[in-house]
Amino acid sequence: MRCELLDYELPEALIASRPPEERDGARLLLVDRGRRAGEVEHAAIRDLDRYIERGALVIVNDTKVVPARLFGRKRGTGGQVELFLLHRLDGAPAGAEDLGGGPQESAPRSERWRAMGRASKPIRPGSVLDIERDGALVAEVLERAEDGVLTVQLSSPAGLSVAAAIDAYGHVPLPPYLGRGDDASDRERYQTIFARVPGAVAAPTAGLHLSPGLVERLRANGVEIASVTLHVGLGTFQPVTVDDLDLHPMHAEVYSIPDATAGAIAGARARGAPVIAIGTTVVRALESAADPARAGLVQAQSGETRLLIQPGYRFRVVDALLTNFHLPRSTLLALVFAFAGRERTLLAYRAAIDAGYRFYSYGDAMLIRGVDAP
């Protein structure tokens, strides 16, 4: 796909810098793949239960966003520095030991991480960074790769586990296009109500819309809800800079499909019910685990995916998609093009812009459903 086809114009005023007052207070654009491109309906997220049929299977992402931005100073010079944690080198998700409530005594007080660093001068191996003046968290730079990614040893001399120190002193990694720093409210609102498994450095944004009340109404209407885990990585912010999308170096993300969810999908297929993905991250996880021998089913598995979905891709698992409005020149927009068609998607985006919908992570959403028109 030529990447110029991923462009569209968006007024800056429509970029949502804050979430709606209520979690389910966003607007909802309804797009039917079986209708003529450009035909849309305007609705509200709080009424989502009206548009999902009884017996449907809704699948959410239960990843938990880690406060991955750390601010401190270089020991000796006092220069300001920022670290953006990417992942632990032992492969464990960020802060897995006790951000989820595990015992402090068993959690490690020293961990090796990959991180991005930013300072007025390059951060070199041997540098020691004091994240907090009281010594609660210290980062020693061990290596610097050619691409600038650092290997750091995090330790907590103050007696906290590293995970607890990150949780206490880290900042929510808001997308750069929001144009602001995080505040206390982002700890709750940049996290879905399903967040359970720490490891993401960006939120699965479609899931941000689902409130406890909305979920309760869905279940009362006979809708089944299951979960997968896909830890959203920093690459989700990476713009497409190549001319041909096939040449884009797709980032890797860790995912897991539990047995219960694989079974729920099999049950939905048996009763002829649709599988509805809450967000593009769920789509990537499910399609990465699609069972090659059994149409429409998935294999319960864990792994790493670099799946790049673009027009021409044949979806094997997902029947409908709730998703936010995405950045131009992004792989997320390419995925939506693949699911709904480029013309239909761009006409829907134009309708949303004309109606003043809010875009991106804290913005409004669209529900894409219906059988794809020939």
Curated annotation (Swiss-Prot):
One Gene Ontology cellular component: cytoplasm
Pfam family, one: Queuosine_synth
Broad class of enzyme this protein falls into: transferase
Tagged with keyword Flavoprotein: no
Superkingdom of source: Bacteria
Subcellular location: Cytoplasm
Catalytic activity, as annotated: 7-aminomethyl-7-carbaguanosine(34) in tRNA + S-adenosyl-L-methionine = epoxyqueuosine(34) in tRNA + adenine + L-methionine + 2 H(+)
Family: Belongs to the QueA family.
Oligomer and partners: Monomer.
Function: Transfers and isomerizes the ribose moiety from AdoMet to the 7-aminomethyl group of 7-deazaguanine (preQ1-tRNA) to give epoxyqueuosine (oQ-tRNA).
PANTHER family reported for this sequence: S-ADENOSYLMETHIONINE:TRNA RIBOSYLTRANSFERASE-ISOMERASE
Name listed for the protein in its UniProt record: S-adenosylmethionine:tRNA ribosyltransferase-isomerase
Annotated organism of origin: Sorangium cellulosum (strain So ce56)
